[in-house]
Amino acid sequence: MPTPSTFVDQTKIEVQAGKGGDGMVAFRHEKFMPNGGPAGGDGGRGGSIIFVADNGLRTLMDFRYRRKFKAEPGENGRIKAQYGKAAKDLYLKVPVGTTVYDFFTGEEIGDLVENGQELVVAKGGRGGRGNIHFATSVNTAPEIAENGEPGEFRTLRLELKVLADVGLVGFPSVGKSTLLSVVTSAKPKIAAYQFTTLKPNLGMVLLPDGRDFSMADLPGLIKGASQGVGLGIQFLRHVERTKVILHMVSMDPNNGRDAYEDYETILHELASYTEDDLSSKREIIVASQMDIPGADEKLAQFKKDLAAHGVDQEVYELSSVTHQGVDRLMSRAADLVSEVEAQEAEAAVKPKEEVKTKTYKYHRPEKMEFTVEKLADHEFEIHGEQLERLVAMTNLDHQDGIMRLARRLKKMGVDDELRAQGAVDGDDVYIGDFSFEFVQ
């Protein structure tokens, strides 16, 4: 039996790009140069996280078991003005057809629609500058270097626009939903009346040999569907996107219908669909409900009628209740899916240079905005993404770095805003993980 598997069509993940390497504070100490200038190199760029569309993947199941991804940081700068090494980017494969959204805002970040297409979803932080960049005529030996910029952190929602590889078609109550529930872990509602399946139910079929494909139980058809009767048009649009059709015909002798007429009616509706002749799709004819007494006689007549009308195809016998014929049918479906995919891949070959990398760009406000919150008497906290990034990139191990940060905060108006909120000398001020005493 195929292994049941839940079909995952959307999931939530977290991505953390790598921090840039820290800039170095260093000085030249060479013979005959006792007063050598600054020689601290820059840190390397942190690794970005990049999605790559891969048409060999069908689901987002890999992201169900691992939801957090972190790229490596860049190397720190070195002495003698040597730059730190940039970190390698982290590439994550996703199925073609994956759309990426910001989990909290719902903003669409990108849509991966071509095999090999890349999307940068979290950009690595730039390396901090070493003290070779901060020498001036006034301060020829600066003890100032920047820490590496933090890598972008994002919470993402991945959504896969599922195109079922195999579509189950046939009149209502021929056993489509039952078959889907047997070969996958999908749990469609099943009942013996028309149009039980109001929308496609999706599942993944995993075969013992490692092959897999997605399968959809589509709404049952009736005569006139191609003209919009019942759920016909919606149904046919779903069929249009499948690779293989499993055409199920009931062998229940008590349903009062002729098996070949049912088969011919469905074929006619598929062929009459105005947007495409769906009857030309690869098809497997399935004689369902073979466990019902009298089904063998009805099957024999069905085969005679097919032959009389020039249909030279094998009919696969199936009982979803007893699982008779399920393994053989699923193996044949996987064979046809592979054949169709090979044909599509050959027809869709494109020069490699046509696939471009897209980068999601976060647009920071031009003005560095911040807010001051009074936590308690003599305690204040300053909020602001860019301000917190500035503090994170400041090397606070050296007095020159601390003084440079103080000057920048004053220039931005932080001191004035703290005074306006009632701050006095000695009050504690917090910016992210950094704290200091306010001085008028």
Curated annotation (Swiss-Prot):
- In this protein, which residues make up the domain named OBG-type G? 164-338
* CDD domains, per database record: Obg
Q: Where does Mg(2+) bind?
A: 177, 197
Single biological process term from Gene Ontology: ribosome biogenesis
Q: Name one Pfam family in it.
A: GTP1_OBG
The yes or no answer to whether the keyword S-adenosyl-L-methionine is present is no
Q: What is this protein called?
A: GTPase Obg
